[in-house]
Amino acid sequence: MKFHLAINLERMNPDTDMTAVRDHTLEMVKMAEAGGFDVVWAAEHHALEMTIAPNPFQILTWWGEHTSHIRLGVGVVNAAYWHPINLAGEAAFLDLTSSGRLEFGVGSGAYQREFDRMKPGLDQRDSWRYMQESLPVVQKLWEGDYA
């Protein structure tokens, strides 16, 4: 059996200081590693009241600097918000700096209100097309130069 933990930099009370939230998430990541968990996951969300998570690669890079063996999972990035070259590069760099600990996850998004802010005019139900288009490109970029 494998154990995974999804952690968001979220606060349930707007009076909670984000520094405390940040510190609490790092503490949970360290506890997960010490407790034998296999993967910790960070999500991508934009302009939601309860969380700050605009780039899971940044969060995971930070967690990776404070851990040694737990795998670092992107759960998930929204393909509609990323150019495939940026997505491939961010993922490859995190995998490099974490000594191969990246678990890559990409999806089509969860909340229409995020699409309204990030990709106005795109219906969340149609965003799978971005994923379908970008995944083969990302894979080719990881294999080498791709035009």
Model-derived segments and their meaning:
Residues 70-76, 103:
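A short, small-residue-rich loop immediately preceding and capping a beta-strand
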Residues 2-19, 81-147:
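Flexible, glycine-rich active-site loops centered on histidine and acidic residues
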Residues 46, 77, 108-109:
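Conserved beta-strand edge residues that scaffold enzyme active sites
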Residues 50, 74-82:
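Active-site nucleophile and cofactor-binding loops and adjacent substrate-binding regions
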Residues 1-67, 71-72:
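N-terminal beta1-alpha1-beta2 module of alpha/beta enzyme domains
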